[in-house]
């Protein structure tokens, strides 16, 4: 009882009462009660506290911050022994409880749950600060924005985002930080301490919580939901940044151009556009980048890594954003809407490109022929007409194509033929796309180096007795001419190019098996026209419906072309008259109505011409 009375009358040696807290006389640490202060004071040893107090001087702010961030504070005038070393990192501590508390940063253990919301914390002091937010106790308010905090330390870290202060500098790379916890995490990257690795892609992290956040990119889990628009996120920080869009908050403003940003990282990347700084260098190709996300995306292109997997179709992607945008193809979500024609798009850049159609801007001009385009991709495709480039090759037959969509359509013919057991049709290899509509008697191909005169009808796959019958649809592919369909009121279906075109009669042609197979029910047809007419009965083969009239199409290009009939958009303008058309093929047909100057020779079009053979000719 006498000991207790003595403790009540005066504090134990090694600490003193300062207001409502107890302050250590050796290191200036404070504690909420006397027992904790006494236990802490015992770690300094039985030194004369009065002499230590005289030696303790206030440290400069920058030195104190660096010590706070590194966890290497010095007690008194000399460093005290730290016998408890962490086996996972270079840190050491004076007591076993301090080491156990530090170990939670490696294991991710959070033994202190919030009774209100269930959120868990590593330290009890963090839980107390969090509980103040539930009680509405946020006494520390930012003077620059409406945010408030329950702890003064959090407010100071937040205010550095407004002032640009970054007092924690890395001695290895010079990078600076505003938050000491982020600085500590960064230092582990130099030490090579990344004990938490992803089982799917092998990526390693220094913190368990970072691994948990990364794993959501593989599983697609997005537990953080925006109450305003319903959009979900995989990280709480992403939700916080997103909510600033609804609140019209852009706390990070560029002093050079006045542009505002919702995220500090976006603001820092924007600053480099003014300075021209590109600090991220690719060691493989030497290319430099101004922001780390572009640099990481570029590195995956070198490595060929596509860790983000679509569960519905099995397609892989390099970026989680690419996977999220791809999923809209399955869900039908098209959140970006044109205000002028109500057309919707999957991605924002598709809407921006579409807006050029309404504005009439065509900034990309061909240097060869002067034709202008609204998109750079359209100019790139058009330039292949002049260069002859056909970069998309079929792995099955070796054919090459100007655009990837033509390759995909061609590959469907292989799949349908394989499903029906029909061998691929033979094709005639020629060097030029010869004019259609000429007829001859011989069926032999011209010898190499011979003069290019009128090709015989048999060479083009027409029956010898057809005379001037026109093949109205031909497809020019690679170095072959493939007969697609021959239509004439009084002429039967034309045989293939190598099916004995010079033989008398049509007995073998009558016995020719059907070549056009339905992809859904495997029924066969003698012409492509009959097949297309039949496939309309299978809605599964037409997965792209028009939202205005309900008509369905087998591919997205057909739907896009059809949707123009509901709007006033006519993107293909005739250079000779004011008329405009829905499609490029309609424009080409119309251009033939304009007279050609007399004496102009009709050159043989190279086989690499994008438009192929003309659809009409002299009978």
From Swiss-Prot:
Entry's Gene Ontology cellular component terms: nucleus
Basic and acidic residues: bias regions: 54-71
Variant or mutagenesis effect after changing residue 66 to T: In a breast cancer sample; somatic mutation
Glycyl lysine isopeptide (Lys-Gly) (interchain with G-Cter in SUMO2) crosslink location in chain: 57, 59, 65, 80, 154, 512
Residue ranges that the Swiss-Prot or TrEMBL entry lists as coiled coil: none
Record's subcellular location: Nucleus
GO MF assignments: DNA-binding transcription repressor activity, RNA polymerase II-specific; RNA polymerase II cis-regulatory region sequence-specific DNA binding; zinc ion binding
Residues with PTM Phosphoserine: 10, 387
Keywords: Acetylation, Disease variant, DNA-binding, Intellectual disability, Isopeptide bond, Metal-binding, Nucleus, Phosphoprotein, Repeat, Transcription, Transcription regulation, Ubl conjugation, Zinc, Zinc-finger
Name of a matching Pfam family: zf-C2H2
UniProt KW Metal-binding keyword: yes
GO biological process: DNA repair; regulation of transcription by RNA polymerase II
Residue span of region Disordered: 34-79, 492-513
Modified residues (N-acetylmethionine): 1
Zinc finger (C2H2-type): 22-44, 84-106, 112-134, 140-162, 168-190, 196-218, 224-246, 252-274, 280-302, 308-330, 336-358, 364-386, 392-414, 516-538, 544-566, 572-594
Family: Belongs to the krueppel C2H2-type zinc-finger protein family.
Record: disease: Neurodevelopmental disorder with poor growth, large ears, and dysmorphic facies: An autosomal recessive neurodevelopmental disorder characterized by severe global developmental delay, brain malformation, microcephaly, growth deficiency, and distinct facial dysmorphism. Disease severity is variable and death in infancy may occur.
Biological function: May be involved in transcriptional regulation. May play a role in DNA repair process.
Name the record gives this protein: Zinc finger protein 668
Species of origin: Homo sapiens
